[in-house]
Amino acid sequence: MCGLARTSADPPEFIVMGGDIAHHGGEFRPTKWLPLPGNVQPSPLVAPYAKIASVCPGSLFEAIHPKKSSTEPFMLPNGPIHDDAGVAVESLEKFTEFDAQENVFAMIAHDRSLLDVVEFYPKPANGWREKGWKEQGRWRFLNDFDTSVETKEAE
C-alpha cells in the first residue's frame, strides 16, 4: 500500500509514500525517466548539506551496476521477502513514474539514506522542495554500494 499526500496546492507538490514497495533505493533507481546523471550532485559519498560543493561522477556507479546501465534499477525484487516478485516489479515500475516527477518526493519505509536528510514528526513535511530533501536524498542510496576497486597481482 502506498500513500500520496499533497504538501502544497500552489505550486502543486506531493510526497508519495511507498511503504514497503521497495526495501532499497536501488530497486527503483535509476530509470529511463530518471537516469543516473553524468555527475551525481550532491555526492552520495559526502554528508548531506555539507558546506562544500560535492560532485561524484555517475560513471563510478555505472561501472558497478550489474548491467552497466544508467537507466535500469541496480537490483530487482527477489527472494522470499516478496510474495510475488513479478507483481513487485510491476508496482515498482508505476512508482518510478512518480519518482521522476519534479513536484513529487518519493520515499520508501525504512530508508536509512534519508535519516540525515528529512525532518521527522511532529515537524511538517510541507516545504520539502525548498528544504532540498529530494535533491539531497535522491541518490543517497548509492553510498551503500562498494565503489572501491580491487586489483589482483599476476602470480
Where do the model's predicted regions map?
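Short beta-strand scaffold segments in enzyme catalytic cores
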Residues: 1-4
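Cap/insert and terminal regions of metallo-dependent hydrolase folds
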Residues: 8-155
